[in-house]
Amino acid sequence: MEKRIGTFYGVSVGPGNPELMTLQAVRRLENCPVIAAPQTPKGGMLALDIAKGAVELSGKTILPLRFAMSLDPAVQKAAHIEAARAVKEYLDAGQDVAMLNLGDVSVYATFGYLQEILEAEGCKTVMLPGVTSFCAAAARLGQSLTGGMEQPLTIAPGRCAAEVLAAPGAKVLMKSGRQLPETLAALADAGLLSWSAMVCNCGLPNEEVWPDLADYDPARSAGYFATILVKEG
């Protein structure tokens, strides 16, 4: 009899509010025996906390995944390999593993690194889509991301602001918290501060909404999960 190998699922949990999780995500987590979730150096597991607001996870195996915050590609790669190895132990034992991902699993998600490693080793992977932080932020602000059916939309990390602001259409600058002073300076240089809004920690208890970044103090710190929406000027 052929040995069963588990499936590795990338499950999107949305930006913060558990009510934004899809039915597909909830059902997959209900049926998956092993739940893998990123863990910060201080032990925080935000994606797991969000999932617990929608799914009863008691009795399941929780697999913490620790990813390096270093900008060194070699250090990052080593962390991805170690995490993939931990996941594969359960897959080889015939157990499905669901990895929780903030926002949508296809957008700046760590799942993709593990997916590449595990697929190269013959493992089956499945991605379950979800609500992105920038779509939730747009809804929170009550604004459309695209003013018309023909308007382009550019999505980039906040550190790339200076490179993409000249592009036509609206822009989404994700994970902008770390480089916020530089991002605000780029917006100011382009004359787009008043055309820009920011939502920090969208859907979480510590959510902050700034409809006009011209009113934002550049010296004020913003969290890692800061999403900036820039209308076409």
Sequence positions of predicted segments:
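Class I S-adenosyl-L-methionine
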Residues: 1-18, 23-124, 218, 223-227, ...
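A contiguous loop/helix-start segment that scaffolds small-molecule binding in enzyme catalytic cores
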Residues: 8, 97, 165-233
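A generic local structural motif
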Residues: 20-24, 84-85, 140-142, 157-161, ...
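Structural signal for conserved beta-strand scaffold positions within catalytic alpha/beta enzyme cores
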Residues: 37, 63-66, 127, 147, ...
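Short gly/pro/ser/thr-enriched loop/turn and capping motifs at secondary-structure boundaries
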Residues: 42-44, 70, 132-135, 204-206
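Short beta->alpha linker loops
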Residues: 46, 102, 129-132, 159, ...
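Short, surface-exposed amphipathic charged segments that create phosphate/polyanion-binding patches used
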Residues: 75-83, 140-143, 167-170, 209-216
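Class I SAM-dependent methyltransferase SAM-binding "motif I" and its flanking Rossmann-like core
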Residues: 106-167, 219
